[in-house]
Amino acid sequence: MRYRKFGRTGWDVSEIGYGMWGMGGWSGSDDSESIGSLQRAIDLGCNFFDTAWVYGNGHSEKLLGQIVRANPSRKLHVASKVPPKNNAWPAPGNSMLEETYPPEHITQFVDQNLLNLGLESLDLIQLHSWNDGWLEDSRIGTALEKLKSSGKVRAVGLSLNRWQPWNGVKAVRAGLADSVQVIYNIFDQNPEDELFPACRENNVAVIARVPLDEGSLTGTLTASSRWPGNDWRNKYFSGENLQETLKRVGALKALLPSGMTLPELALRFILSNPDVSTTIPGMRKTRNVEMNTAVSQNGPLPADLLAELRKHRWVRKVTPESFAAKVKRKLRSFLPTR
């Protein structure tokens, strides 16, 4: 496993981190399997783990706390998130801080995060949605600094809205965040335009999420792909989106060098960008842990292949069937009304 600096924190984090959204009780999740996969990742050098309260009302956090306590001799970086008070994803453009992240709400949920994890402090706490307009309210900066000075958290970050990597650039330049979490993959390359340069200039860490594009870049989707029950992927990969996705994935498969899988291509594309501190694929099964962590040893992609992949940027249209709309409904079902 290779390690990278996590921005101005100076932490050495594994460039393949661990995204724990799928361990919050979603379809197909199994706690014993999850614990086994987490331990295997640790044994293979993974030391950065990203969770959130909304991943099963703290269930994912409890699993992470369990595995951290089972490995007391290893330095594992724990990152979690505070949901917005109004339970709205993505953050409405006209929302005010009082509706989303008033200081007392942030403090309350950090205490809940720590209780679920069974830990005394967090390495990184992130706001689970963000709008640069909230910078106009000075309370947000004060609240986050108080958290760090209290010793409850070591660093603070922002999880940016899907399709809005620009909506966080002001916060980065203002020095509010130690890290940003953003969707970045072969299709979603927009963070390279404004966000990554701002992070580079201000020594802010970048967490690349959704590296496999909700599963399309595993290369296993077909025209008949379906998921159990009301799994959100049935909406996301439906109709024209599924057909267009399959077409674009097929074009990527045609570029694969001999012996390289599509997931390896996708992860190495991300890791070829030095602005990325870590990427956090979801890995509920041990075999996926082993395949994904092994990618780290292969290094960046060849320059000519990387240049070809730059041509595959895809700006999806936001529709009612989009993940953003689906996750908003799903997460509201997890959260209490306040």
Language model feature labels by segment:
Residues 114-133:
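Active-site groove signature of glycoside hydrolases
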Residues 57, 129-321, 332-338:
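Beta/alpha (TIM)-barrel catalytic core signal, keyed to glycine-rich beta->alpha loops juxtaposed to Asp/Glu
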Residues 6, 18, 34, 41, ...:
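Conserved, mostly hydrophobic/aromatic
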Residues 29-41, 100-117, 162-171:
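Short, acidic/polar
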